[in-house]
């Protein structure tokens, strides 16, 4: 079994191709003919205090004595026909936008922005001084997420970020994880990209499955915040999770799916390279970063 798992991991890397530069905070991962870039906006010392229900023994076992890093990431997808941004970071210092430019894409050339959820470290680069940073882009997000953060429990930052895109905002109903696990065809929001519901962190928290040819990558967004602990102990949630019980449940389901189907995952709070393979490890999971 271990040999088969290893071969699956090797095949995933060989089939898709990887390379990157940690100094630049950019990691490129090939999904068939698609180029996916993980972009680091910021990295700082992590805080295990955000974990809910983690005892001292677990923290000591999984977190090094010298601590760990917390990162905030965004993604850029070049399909050959479209330039697609998945989440935009906080907007601090214009870092995400500058790195997108470095990758050869002017903000005016971004065709779509996919928002996983409406927390400030995911929509922050959408607007600057009340104007759209990506003026020609359509902004896609879950209808449930939009309803919650603009009407049910309005968030001023989210409203301000989306206002310049009032005529360019597109909502969707994400597919069910059970359908993906059953290998059913999911409804695409854009060619090669399908949204999948992962509610718990927020009411409309959404993942995106990127597919081209036989290659896949699952953008898990904020499924977890402290990878060192939450991969092996998926029942541990974070204070940021609005529904911690639901977040823990969907976390385990998603990791089971990724491990079983050998689908690499990419996360917004997974340290560089931010992309890797998930395998079963006892009652939890192991994350192996791409190299």
Q: Which role does the model predict for each range below?
A:
Residues 1-4:
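Positively charged n-region of N-terminal signal peptides that target proteins for export
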Residues 7-15:
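Bacterial N-terminal signal peptides
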Residues 21-23, 30, 105, 109, ...:
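Metallo-beta-lactamase
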Residues 22-102, 207-223:
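Conserved beta-strand hairpin/beta-sheet module of binuclear metal-dependent hydrolase folds
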Residues 24, 118-125, 148, 178-179, ...:
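Active-site environment of divalent metal-dependent phosphoester hydrolases
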Residues 85-89, 111-121, 140-142, 197-200, ...:
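Active-site neighborhood of phospho(di)ester-bond hydrolases with catalytic His/Asp-centered motifs
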Residues 93-140:
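Active-site metal-binding motif and surrounding structural segment of the metallo-beta-lactamase
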Residues 213-291:
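Cap/insert and terminal regions of metallo-dependent hydrolase folds
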């Amino acid at each position: 079994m271990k040999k088969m798992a290893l071969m699956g991991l090797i095949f995933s890397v060989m089939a898709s191709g990887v390379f990157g530069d940690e100094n630049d905070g950019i990691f490129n991962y090939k999904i068939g003919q698609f180029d996916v870039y993980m972009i680091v906006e910021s990295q700082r010392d992590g805080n295990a205090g955000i974990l809910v229900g983690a005892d001292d023994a677990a923290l000591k076992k999984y977190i090094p004595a010298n601590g760990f890093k917390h990162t905030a990431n965004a993604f850029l997808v070049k399909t050959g026909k479209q330039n697609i941004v998945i989440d935009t970071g906080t907007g601090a210092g214009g870092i995400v936008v500058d790195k997108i430019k470095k990758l050869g894409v002017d903000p005016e050339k971004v065709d779509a922005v996919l928002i996983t959820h409406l927390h400030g470290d995911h929509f922050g680069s959408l607007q600057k001084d009340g104007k759209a940073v990506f003026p020609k882009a359509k902004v896609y997000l879950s209808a449930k997420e939009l309803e919650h953060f603009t009407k049910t429990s309005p968030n001023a930052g989210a409203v301000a970020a989306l206002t310049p895109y009032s005529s360019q905002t597109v909502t969707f109903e994400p597919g069910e994880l059970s359908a993906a696990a059953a290998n059913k065809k999911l409804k695409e929001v854009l060619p090669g990209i399908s949204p999948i519901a992962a509610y718990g962190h927020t009411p409309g928290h959404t993942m995106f499955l990127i597919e081209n040819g036989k290659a896949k990558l699952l953008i898990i967004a904020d499924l977890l915040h402290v990878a060192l602990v939450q991969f092996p102990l998926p029942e541990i949630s974070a204070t940021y999770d609005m529904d911690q019980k639901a977040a823990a449940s969907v976390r385990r389901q998603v990791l089971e799916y990724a491990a079983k189907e050998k689908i690499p995952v990419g996360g917004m709070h997974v340290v560089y390279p931010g992309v890797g393979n998930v395998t079963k490890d006892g009652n939890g999971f192991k994350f192996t970063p791409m190299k």
